[in-house]
């Protein structure tokens, strides 16, 4: 029963292990050489073969700001009156209250964006009016002198 089975001798087994080891060394050497070659090509001028993305279209917003349509917006989560909100925006990343003069995004879209990120609350935004004029919002008239006392959320943009 055991006589027909062939067991490799110790010398044959070492020979197989040695061949396996040499083969592993050969593969590792090949991989190291190809990595060094690729690195050398990238460092010394062969970088034209790699397609690089243009950085012109990339913009970064400060932490806790939302990037949208090439502009950054900060949606407050605390209430301030208009004057304090405007000052906060000026002191925060050199920004302003979001306003109706923005060329990148109209105010309606901005307020719809605020619903997406936060809630249906009201926000201070800067809307240019001639002096001593009032604006009608939701069937209510607010004059500029009242804004110092009304506290609500606000949106900064830069």
Swiss-Prot record:
Disulfide bonds join 61-72. Residues 61-157 are annotated as: Lectin-like. Residues 48-158 are extracellular. It is a single-pass type II membrane protein. InterPro entries: C-type_lectin-like/link_sf, C-type_lectin/matrix_domain, CTDL_fold. Induction: Expressed in the early phase of the viral replicative cycle. Expressed in the late phase of the viral replicative cycle. The chain crosses the membrane at residues 27-47. It is found in: Host endoplasmic reticulum membrane. Residues 1-26 are cytoplasmic. One of its GO terms (biological process) is symbiont-mediated perturbation of host apoptosis. Belongs to the asfivirus lectin-like protein family. Down-regulates MHC-I expression by impairing the appropriate configuration or presentation into the plasma membrane of the latter. Participates in viral hemadsorption, which may help viral spread. Reduces the transactivating activity of host TP53, thus inhibiting apoptosis. Non-essential for virus growth in swine macrophage cell cultures. This is Lectin-like protein EP153R. The lineage of its organism: Viruses, Varidnaviria, Bamfordvirae, Nucleocytoviricota, Pokkesviricetes.
